[in-house]
Amino acid sequence: MQTVACFGDSLIYGFPFGPRTSWLAEAEKVTGDKFLNYGVCGDCTDDILSRLKTMTLPAHIKHILFLGGANDIIQMRPQKFILEDLDKTLRYCQSKNFDLGIVLPLVTAESRLNEYILPLRDVISACFAERTLLLDLQPAVGLTAAELKDAYLDGVHPTAAVYRAMGTYAAPLLRNWLEKDNSK
């Protein structure tokens, strides 16, 4: 069993249900690994990075998951700032010998928000795919307009069933990441 410190926004936290209904809780059930939930609703990538840098983590932590970007878009932070925050996060994790996994921002049921999220997902993939684990949970959520409408309570926060599906989908990918790193 390994432990992963998970930093992010409401989608890490499991809003509106809370950490026990988050996708991390489901991944924990499936894998038997421990996923520490450090999600804070409303956080932007700079907030998440700041918490990561200032929080005292258990000494045995070797893996960090990071999910952010949607709140940055909502608050009209430029994509450039988000990418800089992700790069700083990767460099910080490398300096502390943490293995970083970046969770791609989810496509929402809000088309105006997706005009910014879709390009951000592409740029994150282009910039970080060769440098760290990228975890794309979108297949568990869906992509068609009907799937997206059904997946979210309010256009951006998943239903409890979708959080479970995200965790079930993520579990083997996370297990593979942890096993691969463990064999180094």
Task: Please state what every model-predicted region is.
Residues 1-41, 46, 51-60:
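Serine-esterase "nucleophile elbow" of acetyl-processing enzymes
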Residues 14-16, 110-184:
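Catalytic His-Asp segment of secreted/periplasmic serine-dependent ester chemistry enzymes
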Residues 17-20, 46-85, 102, 108:
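Oxyanion-hole/transition-state-stabilizing segment in secreted/luminal serine hydrolases
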Residues 23, 27, 51, 82-89, ...:
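A general structural detector for well-ordered alpha-helical segments in enzyme core domains, enriched
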Residues 31, 96-97, 130-131:
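Helix C-cap/helix->beta junction micro-motif
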Residues 37-39, 104, 136:
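Residue-level recognition of beta-strand->loop/alpha-helix junctions
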Residues 57-61, 96-97, 177-178:
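Glycine-rich phosphate-binding loop signature in dinucleotide/nucleotide-binding domains
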Residues 67-68, 89-120:
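Active-site segments of SGNH/GDSL-like serine hydrolases
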